[in-house]
């Protein structure tokens, strides 16, 4: 009986050791990448860049995301669960600039460095909670919106009736793009923003919202969408109204489908970000912080306006 108990205990001990070794991936440090969603090409590209960097730097990358980009509560749960697994660093694209801060308090308490990617934290909420990110990795969304607005003014000769598809109200990324666009066009007396409504980053909502917008304002001749998915939805609404070729569409992200639309002439332009570069820089920054290296508070990723003249 004693021998049997000893054998069982030994087997359990070996099993536990194997489990720990497997979880730690042979002692490699683990970086968690928590994305808004993986049902969007932008974040799929970001994951790809992050994985390439993780493979090159010899760290384990754990990637999780909510089903929908607007599901802040699910993202908060993911963050809390990731921290409990003993990660060494956390890179996150916040679904809610304010809401996510309460989950990041747990990362702070666990001394897990935080790398914020693409969407900034609300500065007041973060300061009030004592949450400080090691760095922000992303493009300047305000400048991107301004780039789109400047293009519209030039392309229309300063005369346009514009409908805007916003992201999620109160969401830093969309708000900054919207502010940049508005600032770019406000000096042109001939440019009028006749409607501006949220479509929550989704293609279906882009279609529905712009279809209703077009019915209410049939004189709209230009649309700025704060993301390409919403822009692609607007293009479908334009086609349904048999107005293809009469309304300029400007998007943001330069997704592959948007580039195809630009080449086909159904979209005028899109502001390109480089999500794979963001993912790469996020993992590189996380590894540097884990090694005690100092990194800049902001790591900027370039922007580029894609039109029919340079689309690839």
Give names to the regions the model predicted.
Residues 1-4, 50:
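Positively charged n-region of N-terminal signal peptides that target proteins for export
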Residues 5-15:
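Bacterial N-terminal signal peptides
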Residues 16-312:
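A residue-level marker of the well-folded mature domains of exported/periplasmic proteins
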